[in-house]
Amino acid sequence: MRIWWLLLAIEICTGNINSQDTCRQGHPGIPGNPGHNGLPGRDGRDGAKGDKGDAGEPGRPGSPGKDGTSGEKGERGADGKVEAKGIKGDQGSRGSPGKHGPKGLAGPMGEKGLRGETGPQGQKGNKGDVGPTGPEGPRGNIGPLGPTGLPGPMGPIGKPGPKGEAGPTGPQGEPGVRGIRGWKGDRGEKGKIGETLVLPKSAFTVGLTVLSKFPSSDMPIKFDKILYNEFNHYDTAAGKFTCHIAGVYYFTYHITVFSRNVQVSLVKNGVKILHTKDAYMSSEDQASGGIVLQLKLGDEVWLQVTGGERFNGLFADEDDDTTFTGFLLFSSP
């Protein structure tokens, strides 16, 4: 139908061209309605193969695949053959003893042997019978003087003898009764000024610092903060007090407990005398101890942590102190 409309339009145009010499051109007509869509053309031929494109960016990793199904259980293998153990045989019977062989021929006579050792002495024989009494012998010599006999009875009292010499002076007799108190005597002259009595002295107080807190275990605690040690009886390098004046001493210690538990002992010459233990409970705590000791010259006293590093919570800073004190109460001869 569209083809017919197309041919008609061409024909009209051709007629108009031929009549231009004789007719005037008229006004253009009103455009007709759009024609219907034409039939689809045939498929074009395949084009030439294009160049290979650039490689695309790697894709994202795929999600893990699902687990495969379990395989079927294999058949049970045949049981292996076990060789049967043989039966133990019976014990054989004991054989009969053999017959005695014939007696051997006598050997030649040996040489004469050496003389044997003397045999042991025989036992004592029985006592023989008493023989007949012999004739009387001659008179013997006079024997020695016999021992002195016992004293005889006391004789009668004799006449008084002459007067003897005077004997030595006897011991002093007991003091007599105290006499009546006498009159007060005159005042004596003033005596000379005596020597001033010098009392022996020994004392110290030491403490820990930030550098010496949390001391090591099982060794003397070295207190390096000197509060009083005028006589140098406490050795800061060794951490020990040494007795220079024999007598009775008082020792005391005051501990600030922080961060860890505390377990200390006061030691005298290597022997633990006094023990103190305190458990840390999340805030600062205090522990202390004191004792009176009799010391001799050269005795040593110190404090030490016992039980390991878990019990060395002895603390010190600008606001907290841990101290060790000792002083002489009185000397002894």
From Swiss-Prot:
Region (Disordered): 24-188
GO cellular-component term (any): collagen trimer
Gene: C1QTNF9
UniProt subcellular location: Secreted
Compositional bias of kind Basic and acidic residues: 42-57, 69-88
Gene3D superfamilies: 2.60.120.40
Molecular function terms from GO: hormone activity; identical protein binding
Collagen-like domain ranges (all copies): 24-82, 95-154, 155-191
Highest taxon of source: Eukaryota
Job description of the protein: Probable adipokine. Activates AMPK, AKT, and p44/42 MAPK signaling pathways.
Tissue spec. comment: Expressed predominantly in adipose tissue.
Modification type 5-hydroxylysine: residues: 73, 127
Pfam families recorded: C1q, Collagen
Protein name: Complement C1q and tumor necrosis factor-related protein 9A
Alphabetic keyword roster: Collagen, Glycoprotein, Hormone, Hydroxylation, Repeat, Secreted, Signal
The protein's assembly and partners: Multimers (predominantly trimers). Interacts with ADIPOQ via the C1q domain to form a heterotrimeric complex. Interacts with CTRP9B. Forms heterotrimers and heterooligomeric complexes with CTRP9B.
Signal peptide per UniProt: 1-19
Keyword Glycoprotein: yes
Glycosylation sites: 73, 127
Repeat recorded as keyword: yes
